[in-house]
Each structure stands twice: as structure tokens, then as C-alpha cells.
Amino acid sequence: MDNVQPKIKHRPFCFSVKGHVKMLRLALTVTSMTFFIIAQAPEPYIVITGFEVTVILFFILLYVLRLDRLMKWLFWPLLDIINSLVTTVFMLIVSVLALIPETTTLTVGGGVFALVTAVCCLADGALIYRKLLFNPSGPYQKKPVHEKKEVL
């Protein structure tokens, strides 16, 4: 008798929770960068947020085009988690530095959006980490060989 496995229907990245969090993260970072540009904030604020926008766009394109499935020689979820944590640290620093002097309203707005971006990046990293931990097809999958056999 044939043991046919049902095909798992692929859910597009844009409709997944991970996709929604990445899109929200991109929107918040672009908004923060726009506020910093309009307010003529110090250049490091604009450069850091601009760099984060390009990195987030890279990861979104990577997942939308499913290039992570083609390039298996890199462990993309680990890179994504590291990126989320580094982005969290940088955006926290930018937001604190933008909020302390309270120079203009737009700079404060950019700082607030950078702070919300940092929280969103932390949530993104936690979401990816949770998916890695509970991935049933990962290397730590429990196999029937490891189960105890009952002796009667």
C-alpha cells in the first residue's frame, strides 16, 4: 500500500505572521527615517535608519522570492535573528539620543517611531527564535528510534 504524504500548502510570505511583522518593521523604520530627514536631524540618525531600511528590504525580498530555500549554505534564520537583535540595539540608541535633547517635534517623532521599531524588532527576533525552537523538521526532530520500547 502506498504511503502518500499530503503536500503541505505553502503560505506566501506576505500573508504570514513573520511577513506582517517584517512589513510593520519596514514601515516604522521608513517613517522614522522620514521624520529625521525632514527635521534635518544629525546624520547618524538618518544613516542608521537608512541602513536598517535596506537590510529589512533585503530580508523581505529574500523571503518573498524564496531565495532562502535556494541558498541553503547560509543559515538564514540565524542571520535574521542576529539582524533583529543588532537592529534593536541600534534603534534603541538612536531613539534615546533623539528623545533626550527634544530639539524639534519631528526629531521627537522620529525618536518615538525608532523606539516602536526597536520593540517590533525584538518581537520579530522572538518570533523567528520561537519558530526555530519548535521547527518539527529541524535537526532535533524526535524520531521513533529514540522512543522507548515496551517489553511485555
Curated annotation (Swiss-Prot):
Regulation: Partly inhibited by interleukin 10.
Domain of life, per lineage: Eukaryota
InterPro entries reported in the protein's UniProt record: Marvel, MARVEL-CKLF_proteins
GO CC term, one of those recorded: extracellular region
Membrane-spanning residues: 45-65, 81-101, 108-128
Gene Ontology MF terms in the entry: chemokine activity
Tissue: Isoform 1, isoform 2, isoform 3 and isoform 4 have highest expression levels in adult spleen, lung, testis, ovary, peripheral blood leukocyte, placenta, pancreas, and in fetal brain, skeletal muscle, thymus and heart. Lower expression levels in adult skeletal muscle, liver, thymus colon, prostate and fetal spleen and liver.
Keyword Ion transport carried by entry: no
Keywords assigned by UniProt, alphabetized: Chemotaxis, Cytokine, Membrane, Secreted, Transmembrane, Transmembrane helix
One GO biological process term: lymphocyte chemotaxis
Record-annotated MARVEL domain positions: 13-133
The protein's role, per its UniProt record: May play an important role in inflammation and regeneration of skeletal muscle. Essential for embryonic development.
Family: Belongs to the chemokine-like factor family.
UniProt protein name: Chemokine-like factor
Species of provenance: Homo sapiens
Lineage: Eukaryota, Metazoa, Chordata, Craniata, Vertebrata
